[in-house]
C-alpha cells in the first residue's frame, strides 16, 4: 500500500470546502450599486458597514444560501483602491465556508498552496483568511470559518 499524503491523514471535514459564502464585487459606490443589486434584482440588503482596519465599506446582500458582497474602498492608497483603478468595477474574490479554518490553512500550507494569511483573522462576518491568486489560477479566494468554529472564540466573536 502506498504511503499516505499529508492531506489523506487529516479528517475529511478539514479537506472539504463548504458552501460558497459570498462572491465579492469591487464597486466605486455602494449606494449607486444598490440600485441594481437591491432595487432591480431584489436581493435582500443584510448589512452595510465600515471596516476601518481594511479601509473599505462593505454591503452584504442575500441570495439563496449565499451572499453578494459589495466592497467600496475608502482610501485611495489601499490594495482594493488600486485594484479598482486598474481593473474597474467587478469580480474581486470568492469566499468558501470551512468547518475549521486553522486546520484548513495548515492543510493548504502542507499541500504547498500560497497563503496571504497563514492564520485566521477577524473578518466582517467571522474568522477569515485569504489564499493567494497565484495558487488559484489568478482568483483571490477567501475562506471563512462556519459559525461556532474554534477560531470564533479566540478572535473574540
Spans of features found by a protein language model:
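Short loop/beta submotifs within extracellular cysteine-rich repeat domains
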Residues: 33, 44, 68, 76-79, ...
Amino acid at each position: 500500500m502506498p504511503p499516505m499524503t499529508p492531506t489523506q491523514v487529516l479528517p475529511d471535514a478539514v479537506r472539504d470546502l463548504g458552501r460558497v459564502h459570498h462572491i465579492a464585487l469591487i464597486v466605486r459606490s455602494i449606494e449607486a450599486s444598490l440600485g441594481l443589486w437591491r432595487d432591480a434584482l431584489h436581493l435582500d440588503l443584510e448589512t452595510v458597514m465600515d471596516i476601518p482596519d481594511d479601509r473599505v465599506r462593505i454591503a452584504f446582500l442575500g441570495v439563496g444560501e449565499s451572499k453578494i458582497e459589495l466592497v467600496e474602498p475608502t482610501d485611495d492608497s489601499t490594495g482594493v483602491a488600486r485594484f479598482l483603478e486598474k481593473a474597474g468595477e467587478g469580480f474581486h474574490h470568492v469566499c468558501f465556508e470551512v468547518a475549521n479554518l486553522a486546520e484548513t490553512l495548515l492543510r493548504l500550507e502542507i499541500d504547498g498552496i500560497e497563503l496571504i494569511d497563514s492564520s485566521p483573522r477577524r473578518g466582517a462576518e467571522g474568522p477569515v483568511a485569504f489564499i493567494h491568486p497565484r495558487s488559484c489560477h489568478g482568483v483571490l479566494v477567501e475562506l471563512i470559518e462556519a459559525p461556532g468554529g474554534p477560531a470564533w472564540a479566540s478572535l473574540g466573536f
